[in-house]
Amino acid sequence: MPVRRRTVLSAVASTALAALALTGCTQDPLAAEFRAGDNKRYIAGDGTFTEVRLADRAAPVDFSGTLADGTEITSADYRGSVTVVNFWYAECPPCRLEAKDLQAASEEHAPDGVKFLGVNTRDQAPNVDSFDSTYGITYPSVLDVEDTSMQLAFAGTIAPNAVPATIVLDRQGRVASRVLGQIDPGVLRTLVSDTVAEPAG
C-alpha cells in the first residue's frame, strides 16, 4: 500500500487555497488529481489526506441544500457535531468502492454523535435512492447537481465537480481534515476520532 502523505495546513496555506478557488483552483492539489483522471470525472487520487491544526482553521463553512427526500438542511443542523461530508455520484467507480466503508464508519462513530452527510454532484433523487439501497447507505445526501450550492460553499477545500472527496468538520463547522480520492477506512477512523477528541467550544 502506498504511503499516504500527512500534512498540516498553516493559516497562510488555508488562505491560499481559498484564493485559488476564486481563480478556478488551477493549482489546487485536488484539481490536479481530477485532471489526472483523464476526464473520467472522478479523482485519480490515492487517498492523500490533510489535517488542519485547531489554531489554523478557517471560519465555519456555511451551507444549505435539499436532501434526496426533499428535506431542506443548513449547516446549523450540524453545528455542535463532528460531521463527515462526502462528495460523490453514482457512476463514480471510487465512490462505489468506498460506499460501504463510509456506511460502516457512520455506524461506528454514531455513539460519539458524529453525523455523516453525502453531497451528490450529478444525480437526481431516484439514482441516489437506488445507490443507497444497493450499498445500504442510511445517512442522507444533498442533491447538488442543479445549483451546486454545496460545492460553492466548500470552494477552496474541494475542486468543483471533483469526486470523491471527504471533509471532516469539527463541532464549530470548520474544516478539520480532508481526504482526496477513495478513503482508507483506517485513515478516516483516525481523522474522525482525532476531531471527536478535541475539546468542545
Segments from the language model and where they lie:
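A short beta-strand-turn-helix
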Residues: 53-83
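Structural microenvironment flanking redox-active thiols in thiol-disulfide oxidoreductases
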Residues: 96-136, 146-153
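N-terminal targeting signals for export/organelle localization
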Residues: 1-62, 201
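Thiol/disulfide oxidoreductase modules built on the thioredoxin-like
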Residues: 130-137, 145-200
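Active-site-proximal beta-strand/loop segments in catalytic clefts of secreted hydrolases
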Residues: 87-89, 119-122, 144-145, 182
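Short active-site neighborhood of thiol/selenol oxidoreductases, capturing the structured segment around
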Residues: 73-96, 102, 116
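Short, ordered coil/turn segments that flank beta-strands lining enzyme active or ligand-binding pockets
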Residues: 23, 68-70, 171
